[in-house]
Amino acid sequence: MKRTVKSIVAILLALIFVFALASCNTVDKTGVWENATYRKDMEFGDGSKTVVVEIKAEENLVTFTIQTANDTVGDALIEHDLISGDDGPYGLYIKKVNGITADYDVDRSYWAFYIDGEYAMTGVDTTKITEGVTYKLEYVKE
């Protein structure tokens, strides 16, 4: 009886360990991720609006869940120093996301912005936050 209980407990602990590892989305510190500020899913802020932003570079992806009082996706990301760039004639030209730099003039790389899987027709600085929508910034190198 004791042996059976110990076996069951050992199996349960092993399963818990496996599920815990699987639920931790952590990216290795290689390639463009070498300079990344965060390499695992993170939560930020305490505002009334929720913004979910996926950051994809190379084959890796992390998700940021941001609670904010801001109205735009860009302001929510800037509030937590998750993006930076240059103001241009079409709005904010994002050069850095999560510490990862993309500069088209240097190596033909840039950050593409998606709203629920569709390429965005607006920039992050003008895109209003919509609850339940997933936004994505993807590192693209031509």
Predicted regions and their residues:
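Ubiquitin-like/PB1-type beta-grasp interaction modules and other compact soluble beta-rich domains
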Residues: 2-13, 18-142
